């Protein structure tokens, strides 16, 4: 008769308790990179929308490794990043209890997609948000606005830019833009405030924040799975086949005393839709939406865009700038992703390696052939009946 061990490592991590639904849909930056006044003034984060995944082929550049200068295949995630629009600046002062916002200065003109963020029901509202505030920019040549900016320069130590996405440029049906604070690092406080003021109502391109071969962090809310049992939620072992009243359970949930179930015991409940930060994703490429060959390489010179044949499944076409990062990131397609510069200087060979892509797969992600472009498919298949019907 077989026997089992009486002790085993626990199943599942207790590091992410409580496993409950995230309070906010957008990933929140809880820590920004440390400020260095010696560096030039720059932004430290951005936002984008997850489009999907694809495959790339490249030569590994890692001297000493067995695969050095050999082709490897890697999975990448495409995140569509239309330019952000800066609409405000916030100044923070340091107190014994942490940072406290001193004042917020808003731009004169705000688009409707960000104004929707301030209303529960945009359709029934009077849409009067910021009409009174906008007059401050005209009164006395914006003296009150200048006064608030000077207060930030005088008292604050941390400066953050308020920026929102241009969600209307994506295939999403949602009309309400996502708004976030992006910390400004580098230079003096006065330099930071002037930098933020000059960004008002201007687009912020993704390549002005991140660059190729950089390591970044992706903050998002994971895919939700609803109420799940203990086996799938915690990875506990299934009980033997002849077990009474169910197999996918925990056989013993605790001792007689203490006479309650301890918090460390694996239980059924909410799985997924958790706030997570995925660290150290290498940027393989930053593509421009205006470039007709933004998925072409020196090895594959065919003119093709990053959108695969038939579009990204459950997303559509990527018509704007995009960022390609190595591996998978949290969240489902269409979900907003918060992209942040890494918190620590990266020194590993993987981080410092220069990546040169040889080929990017743009075939259908729905299983209809391996054709990379419509022209390639037409050349192979010839004239089809549906083409004749369409032309007629």
From Swiss-Prot:
Which keywords, in A-to-Z order, does the entry hold?
Allergen, Cytoplasm, Ribonucleoprotein, Ribosomal protein
> Major place of localization?
cytoplasm
Instruction: Name the Gene Ontology molecular function terms of this record.
Output: RNA binding; structural constituent of ribosome
Q: Where is this protein found?
A: Cytoplasm
One biological process term from GO is:
translation
* One GO cellular component term: cytosolic large ribosomal subunit
The protein's matches in Gene3D superfamilies, at most eight in alphabetical order, are given as:
3.30.1430.10, Ribosomal protein L3, domain 3, Translation factors
Q: Which PROSITE patterns match?
A: RIBOSOMAL_L3
Q: Which InterPro entries match?
A: L3_arc_euk, Ribosomal_L3_dom_3_arc_sf, Ribosomal_uL3, Ribosomal_uL3_CS, Transl_B-barrel_sf
- Assigned protein family: Belongs to the universal ribosomal protein uL3 family.
Physiological role: The L3 protein is a component of the large subunit of cytoplasmic ribosomes.
Q: What is this protein called?
A: Large ribosomal subunit protein uL3
Q: Which organism is it from?
A: Aspergillus fumigatus (strain ATCC MYA-4609 / CBS 101355 / FGSC A1100 / Af293)
């Amino acid at each position: 008769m077989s026997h089992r061990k009486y002790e085993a490592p626990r199943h599942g991590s207790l590091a992410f308790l409580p496993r409950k639904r995230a309070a906010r849909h957008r990933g929140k930056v809880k820590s920004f990179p440390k400020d260095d006044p010696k560096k030039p003034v720059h932004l430290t984060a951005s936002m984008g929308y997850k489009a999907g995944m694809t495959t790339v082929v490249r030569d590994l550049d890692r001297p000493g490794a067995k695969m050095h200068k050999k082709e490897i295949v890697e999975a990448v995630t495409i995140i569509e990043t239309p330019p952000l629009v800066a609409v405000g600046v916030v100044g923070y002062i340091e107190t014994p209890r942490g940072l406290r916002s001193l004042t917020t200065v808003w731009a004169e003109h705000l688009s409707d997609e960000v104004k929707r963020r301030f209303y529960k029901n945009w359709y029934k509202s009077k849409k009067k948000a910021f009409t009174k505030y906008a007059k401050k920019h005209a009164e006395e040549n914006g003296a009150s606005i200048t006064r608030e900016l000077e207060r930030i320069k005088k008292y604050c130590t941390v400066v953050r830019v308020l920026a929102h996405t241009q969600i209307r440029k994506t295939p999403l049906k949602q009309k309400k833009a996502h708004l976030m604070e992006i910390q400004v690092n580098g230079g003096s406080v006065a330099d930071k405030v002037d930098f933020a003021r000059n960004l008002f109502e201007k687009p912020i391109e993704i390549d002005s924040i991140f660059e190729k071969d950089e390591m970044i962090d992706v903050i998002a809310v994971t895919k939700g799975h609803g109420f799940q049992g203990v086996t799938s939620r915690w990875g506990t072992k299934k009980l033997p086949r002849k077990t009474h009243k169910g197999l996918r359970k925990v056989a013993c949930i605790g001792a007689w005393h203490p006479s309650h179930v301890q918090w460390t015991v694996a239980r059924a409940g909410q799985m997924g839709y958790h706030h997570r930060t995925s660290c150290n994703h290498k940027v393989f490429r930053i593509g421009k939406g205006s470039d007709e060959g933004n998925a072409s390489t020196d090895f594959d010179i065919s003119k093709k865009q990053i959108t695969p044949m038939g579009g990204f499944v459950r997303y559509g076409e990527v018509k704007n700038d995009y960022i390609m990062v190595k591996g998978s990131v949290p969240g489902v397609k269409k979900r907003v992703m918060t992209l942040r510069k890494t918190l620590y200087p990266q020194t590993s060979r993987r981080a410092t390696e220069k990546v040169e892509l040889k080929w990017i797969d743009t075939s259908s992600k729905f299983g209809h052939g391996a054709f990379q472009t419509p022209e390639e498919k037409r050349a192979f298949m010839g004239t089809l009946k549906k083409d004749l019907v369409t032309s007629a």
